[in-house]
Amino acid sequence: MGDSIRIVKTTSENPDFLSLIKTFDVYLWDRYPELKTNYWGNNIIELNRNVVVIYLDEKPVACGCFKKYDKNTIEIKRMFVAPEARGLGLAQRILQELEQWSLELGYSISILETLYKQQEAISLYQKVGYEIVDNYEPYVGLENSICMRKQIVRIDL
């Protein structure tokens, strides 16, 4: 792979986003089949206008989106980097893009949920300023969930 990176703001109807999400779901359920029953409904993305897809040499390799949680808060959803593109800092780029986009829309707080078994994801989120908090709805009572929160600040991308 070369190093041509293109970041696209799009919607959940984008075919490349949908393809990445299908790959992500297969990855999750292959890795954690025991969790599928409790978590499937929380990962369905309805029409969403706040989606980012990253292309590496014109191939879609990473994605993420956010949705409104409350008047000040967005929830980061469906963060995924394809295995062949990991280690290139793309997950951080997605988070930065989503956070800055949410600031432009007037939000100041970002929350997210990940599985406690996703230690690499937890480490990434902590590295970029997220802190573990009590589980928020709809994750209250789900022992496998780790919820995190961050005050968003403007950065120059």
Model-derived regions, located:
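Acetyl-CoA-dependent GNAT
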Residues: 2-77, 82-83, 95-97, 135-138, ...
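Conserved acidic functional residues
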Residues: 69, 99, 113-115
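C-terminal "cap" of GNAT-fold acetyltransferases
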Residues: 13, 108-110, 115-128, 134-157
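Conserved GNAT acetyl-CoA-binding A-motif
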Residues: 95, 102-113
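Conserved acetyl-CoA-binding loop-helix of GNAT-fold acetyltransferases
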Residues: 81, 87-100, 127
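Residues that form or flank phosphate/diphosphate-binding pockets in enzymes
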Residues: 16, 89, 120
